[in-house]
Amino acid sequence: MEFHENRAKAPFIGLVQLWQAVRRWRRQMQTRRVLQQMSDERLKDIGLRREDVE
């Protein structure tokens, strides 16, 4: 494989990693919002306490 054949892919790795980090952060925020809206009884059912989600 020649140098120029592999060169174009490298800059996109950083963009892919950034996009994955943004997606992960958005999922975590969405999960936190859902958990914060749950009642204490529901949180207890899934093994969490109010302090765990705040």
Curated annotation (Swiss-Prot):
Top-rank taxon, per record: Bacteria
Name of this protein: Uncharacterized protein YjiS
